[in-house]
């Protein structure tokens, strides 16, 4: 994720006069609203995710997060997992990934994430934003800021709360992963299996997935391990590993390289589960149980897209 936490949040809150993206966003959201038959809040979050990232896109409909249906929350999380944010684009470009591939992958993931999320978690309730596209960060409510300075202060306080929740959830999940890897390594030593970890196991599980992606047969296992690195660690670590492979004496073929670039693009990893739970949980405390319940399902859906 973009771990821009406090800064991104307070920037969104203080930008009601200066944030020009808001004026263009409804047009993009309207397209998905009309073509994908989703609620206005879902359309806004999905359309904004490739630009401002997971979690932060929900700030654009902040007053409605607390009254979202379970299906809407699932879609909001899925769209965040399936894309990257503009704030990390340059970092991936510096690793040798062409910008057009990253942007294309993120944009294509918007309708894909909507479709997969709705197949996995169909809407059974009536969303409050059904029939209208709405962009509302809460600047016109009873707690509306008096001026830009007040808005920045409110955003900073909220961002601090979000950052604390992100840190707590992220440390919990990363600690759990480390504990599982330690247990697997200990068990593996008893069976003479060196370095048995989640990444290794998931890499073999992803072998058929990588095959269906169209990767040449001789390179399937290497690409599958990169996908496992993305899921267990994060996409940045996976792109670093991809860069190392491409600079080695045995690089991937051009076809496998391009497919891998697209497959690794997105925030779908175990660490991001903690981030999204923290961000959305701060905006909608009453939905904390729902957010935690659908988080892993949304991550898998986001990974698929």
Where are these regions (language model features)?
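Transmembrane helical segments that form the transport core of multi-pass membrane transport proteins
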Residues: 157-248
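Alpha-helical membrane segments and immediately flanking helix-loop junctions
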Residues: 35-94, 109, 224-305
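Long, contiguous bundles of hydrophobic transmembrane helices that form the permeation core
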Residues: 107-110, 114-160
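Hydrophobic transmembrane alpha-helical segments of multi-pass transport and channel proteins
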Residues: 103, 107-119, 159, 163, ...
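Hydrophobic core segments of alpha-helical transmembrane domains in multi-pass membrane transport
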Residues: 5-14, 82-91, 106-120, 169-182, ...
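Hydrophobic alpha-helical hairpins/lids featuring a short glycine-rich hinge
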Residues: 1-38
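Juxtamembrane loop-helix boundary motifs flanking transmembrane segments in multi-pass membrane proteins
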Residues: 16, 20-27, 39-40, 52, ...
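Membrane-lumen (extracellular) interface motif
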Residues: 88-108, 187-194
